[in-house]
């Protein structure tokens, strides 16, 4: 077994503020003066389990509506506040943390309809803003969820563009609810094209060309949304310009198709619909439907939920799927939906020594491995032939390497103990990386040196 540690030549501490207002001794005096914490009464409640008495002296605190519990909470809050307020360095710590966190953040860009999009947070905004960038107009705010409500309680997620980039659909949540609506806009004019879809929960938005999209939800529960049981997820197809009541139920309408979570992916050529169905967050079944065949039959790829599987890319008539089926560290397989038997599966990226996280973009596959807590990224073609190992800026963590098949450049984010997250461009044909956006963090990583050191443990490993 390997052990390692990272040594840092210099250490930044919050007590290195410009003008600390009190010494440790002064703080200790003030904290002592703040007084001790209030006492908590012990009750006499006893439970008996299988003939054994189990005292539960604080059972009375479980009644959060009682006057005694309310009084106890008030006393605890008062005591805690007096303790915190007595820490004279607290304001300095607050200023330092605010200075280190209040800087502009940006995500790696993505493309839709040939237009570049990215998210940006100016520093302390509640929600990041979606921007678009064109050669003639430069950067423009495209969607700003901070303006969707006066009190900031409406959030945006799941932004998804149609194939040609002319339409965008996104989900809105009010007050943190899992029940959401889907809004559809015209990208050029910004106009909302139709009434929002409602009562959507735990859903993606997967477009089929420019005609409409697949989404998932449960039947609207009777009574409380917070306590009602939702255990049969259903996949629908919404055709643009039609009412939600006319949406086609694609999967999940029968007992045989009953699952708690159902999602959809469409292959790059629009031919195959791949449905993931699961009853937990680990393991899923996979079904495929040939949208060009005209029949509603589902082809079963993963018959049970013993492993995870998800569509990564499509290549000719083959589906490239990342899975840990018979491969705990993960692998990428090619499956012909017309020959779905596992004996016909082809390893594209076989299981290796390290856990695999695969992405696709620009007509290539990128295998991301975590090796001794450091990212290693290898580029393959869609047939599984290794192209190169990607040279990263330093020892650290890289993520991204995904995009459309026709993209000429891909983007990834890199960070480590010294480098705040920065965005790099990868030329997938040459394997060259260049800095695209440096971090705006005020943290000066050049003051530090990071090393990775290995040593033998007591048992010699």
Regions found by a protein language model. Name each.
Residues 141-205, 209-210:
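A conserved hydrophobic secondary-structure block that centers on an alpha-helix together
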Residues 131-134, 183-188, 229-242, 287-291, ...:
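Beta-propeller blade signature
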Residues 68-160, 171, 260-290, 295-314, ...:
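Non-catalytic accessory segments flanking enzyme active sites
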Residues 121-128, 149-153, 172-181, 196-201, ...:
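A flexible loop/linker signature enriched in serine peptidases of the S9 family
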Residues 116, 165-169, 213-214, 273, ...:
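Hydrophobic beta-strand positions that form the internal "hydrophobic ladder"
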Residues 13-16:
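C-terminal motif of bacterial Sec signal peptides marking the signal peptidase cleavage site
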Residues 145, 187-199, 242-255, 292-302, ...:
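Blade-edge beta-strand/turn elements of extracellular beta-propeller
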Residues 18-20:
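Bacterial signal peptide processing site
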């Amino acid at each position: 077994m390997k052990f390692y540690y990272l040594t840092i030549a210099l250490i930044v501490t919050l007590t290195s503020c410009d003008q600390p207002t009190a010494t440790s001794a002064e703080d200790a005096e003030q904290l002592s003066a703040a007084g001790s914490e209030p006492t908590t009464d012990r009750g006499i409640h006893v439970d008996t389990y299988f003939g054994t008495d189990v005292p539960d002296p604080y059972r009375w605190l479980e009644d959060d509506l009682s006057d005694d519990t309310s009084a106890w909470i008030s006393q605890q809050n008062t005591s805690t506040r007096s303790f915190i307020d007595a820490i004279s360095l607290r304001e300095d710590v607050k200023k330092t943390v605010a200075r280190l966190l209040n800087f502009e953040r940006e995500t790696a860009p993505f493309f839709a309809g040939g237009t570049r999009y990215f998210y940006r947070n100016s520093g302390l905004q509640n929600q990041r803003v979606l921007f678009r960038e064109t050669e003639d107009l430069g950067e423009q705010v495209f969607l700003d969820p901070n303006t969707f409500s006066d009190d900031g309680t409406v959030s945006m997620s799941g932004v998804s563009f149609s194939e040609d980039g002319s339409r965008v659909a996104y989900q809105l949540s009010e007050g943190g609810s899992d029940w959401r609506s889907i809004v559809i806009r015209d990208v050029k004019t910004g106009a909302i094209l139709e009434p929002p879809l409602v009562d959507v929960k735990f859903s993606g938005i997967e477009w089929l060309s420019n005609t409409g999209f697949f989404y998932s939800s449960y039947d609207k529960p009777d009574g409380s949304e917070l306590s009602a049981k939702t255990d049969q997820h259903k996949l629908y197809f919404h055709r643009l310009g039609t009412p939600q009541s006319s949406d086609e139920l694609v999967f999940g309408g029968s007992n045989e198709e009953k699952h708690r979570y159902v999602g959809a992916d469409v292959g790059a050529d629009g031919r195959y619909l791949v449905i993931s169905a699961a009853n937990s967050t680990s393991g899923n079944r996979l079904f495929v439907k040939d949208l060009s065949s005209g029949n509603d039959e589902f082809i079963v790829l993963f018959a049970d939920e013993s492993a995870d599987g998800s569509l990564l890319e499509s290549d000719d008539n083959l589906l490239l799927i990342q899975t840990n089926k018979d491969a705990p560290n993960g692998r990428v397989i090619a499956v012909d939906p017309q020959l779905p038997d596992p004996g016909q599966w082809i390893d594209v990226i076989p299981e290796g020594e390290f856990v695999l996280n695969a992405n696709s973009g620009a007509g290539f596959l990128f295998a991301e491995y975590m090796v001794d807590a450091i990212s290693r990224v290898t580029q393959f073609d869609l047939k599984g032939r290794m192209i190169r190992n990607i040279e990263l800026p330093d020892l650290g963590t890289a993520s991204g390497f995904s995009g459309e098949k026709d993209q000429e450049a891909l983007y990834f984010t890199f960070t480590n103990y010294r480098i705040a997250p920065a965005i790099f461009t990868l030329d997938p044909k040459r394997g060259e990386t260049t800095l695209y956006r440096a971090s705006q963090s005020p943290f000066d990583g050049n003051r530090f040196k990071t090393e990775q050191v290995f040593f033998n443990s007591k048992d010699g490993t």
